[in-house]
């Protein structure tokens, strides 16, 4: 019986393991399917990581290296090249590796840190032929940054998520011509700083409310047809533009990788596509926790690490205490303008001082206010100058406020009309 097994050795798994060790656990095992720790950070060679966590700008591999160095100062065990096949409700982990073959591990506590994966062309149903030269932005990033291959010379990017924006800059720096970035929504899905640094600084046009309606080519992509879309995201006839390209990169969203979570019977949130979690990142199964992009997709790895610190500390407390909480829980409900909240459930009796609520808005907002209500009563209000779907918002709800609630809490957004 292992005290704590962590599934995934990316930024979430590394932070959770170190936090659990710092909080008194000594029997910790990380299972990582890749041949090295660090996860997606290893291919993110651009800077911008670590400002919140370490107080300086780091590249992805540097950030991962800092986390791995911290882990080396502990006695946490790591098994690389180990694929987890199943997690059961009674906390048994079925995994396989070349060195040890098929194993069934029993754990007192589990933290799920599997991260997320990219949506593919098949997931969004782009019409046209199926030639070579169509990649997800993350796959292209790995080819360019880790394998040393330039995937194309004339590039069109569909989607304005952060990976797509960063790859627009990377492909330009590597000598390719990025003709445009095309986004089906009327707003960008990425951080404002990435739009400025990756598109505007390199004079790459961004077409909002546009999408690809046709791809032409035999052995290789030759042309892509882009059209404007209406408010229902349907192409508008007569607005087509043709681009002569040999490569199309897709940055059309990320999906939390939750096959193991569903297999374990853990309740899921249809909005985040991740597990429903309590204020301490515990899932619906006592002793099983989840953190990072497997719960909801983050903008910054620093926030992943912070969330994982909490999960690691909570798992340590669960194992050392030896019992699950039986405190009453309140539901957090996304109201007007809010896409989701994490956590989805809060136990006021178990909150120390306050609980941090993360959420995303459904559209761009100017001056606005975030309200927290219970049964029509307003319990809290927070002001913001601007909010966008591509940037996660955070509010802190104090314990004293939570104790006033006698039912579900609704988090909503209202735009402030200037008088």
Which residues does each PLM region occupy?
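Beta1-alpha1 glycine-rich phosphate/pyrophosphate-binding loop at the start
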Residues: 2-66, 70, 142, 151-197
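FAD-site-proximal beta/loop scaffold in flavoenzymes
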Residues: 112, 134-144, 247-298
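FAD-binding core/adjacent interface of flavoenzyme oxidoreductases
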Residues: 1-7, 65-154, 231-238, 249, ...
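Rossmann-like nucleotide/phosphate-binding core characteristic of flavoprotein oxidoreductases
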Residues: 1-3, 80, 316-419
């Amino acid at each position: 019986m292992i005290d704590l097994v962590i599934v995934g050795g990316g930024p979430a798994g590394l932070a959770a393991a170190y936090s659990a060790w710092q909080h008194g656990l000594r029997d910790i095992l990380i299972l990582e399917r890749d041949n090295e720790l660090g996860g997606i950070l290893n291919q993110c060679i651009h800077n911008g990581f670590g400002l919140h966590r370490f107080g300086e700008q780091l590249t992805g591999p540097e950030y991962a290296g800092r986390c791995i160095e911290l882990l080396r100062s502990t006695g946490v065990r790591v098994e690389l090249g180990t694929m987890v096949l199943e997690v059961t409700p009674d906390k048994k982990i079925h995994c396989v590796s070349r060195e040890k073959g098929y194993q069934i591990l029993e754990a007192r506590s589990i933290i799920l840190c599997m991260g997320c994966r990219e949506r593919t062309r098949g997931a969004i149903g782009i019409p046209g032929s199926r030639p070579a030269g169509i990649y997800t932005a993350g796959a292209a990033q790995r080819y360019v940054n880790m394998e040393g291959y330039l995937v194309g010379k004339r590039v069109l990017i569909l989607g304005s998520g952060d990976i797509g924006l960063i790859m627009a800059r990377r492909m330009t720096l590597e000598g390719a011509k990025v003709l445009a970035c095309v986004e089906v929504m009327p707003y960008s899905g990425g951080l404002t700083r990435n739009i400025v640094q990756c598109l505007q600084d390199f004079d790459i046009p961004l077409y909002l409310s546009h999408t690809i309606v046709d791809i032409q080519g035999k052995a290789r992509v030759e042309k892509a047809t882009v059209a404007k879309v209406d408010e229902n995201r349907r192409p508008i006839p007569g607005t087509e533009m043709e681009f002569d390209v040999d490569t199309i990169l897709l940055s059309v969203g990320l999906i939390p990788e939750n096959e193991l979570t569903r297999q374990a019977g853990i309740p899921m949130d249809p909005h985040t596509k991740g597990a429903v979690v309590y204020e301490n990142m515990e899932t619906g199964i006592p002793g099983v926790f989840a953190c990072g992009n497997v719960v909801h997709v983050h903008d910054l790895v620093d926030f992943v690490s912070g969330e994982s610190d909490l999960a690691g500390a909570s798992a340590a407390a669960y194992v050392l205490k030896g019992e699950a909480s039986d405190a009453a829980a309140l539901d957090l409900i996304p109201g007007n303008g809010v896409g989701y909240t994490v956590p989805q459930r809060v136990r006021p009796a178990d909150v120390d001082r306050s609980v941090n609520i993360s959420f995303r808005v459904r559209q761009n907002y100017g001056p606005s206010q975030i309200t927290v209500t219970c049964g029509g009563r307003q319990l809290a209000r927070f002001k913001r100058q601007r909010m966008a779907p591509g940037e996660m918002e955070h509010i802190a709800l104090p314990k004293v406020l939570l104790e006033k609630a006698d039912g579900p809490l609704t988090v909503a957004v209202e735009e402030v009309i200037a008088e």
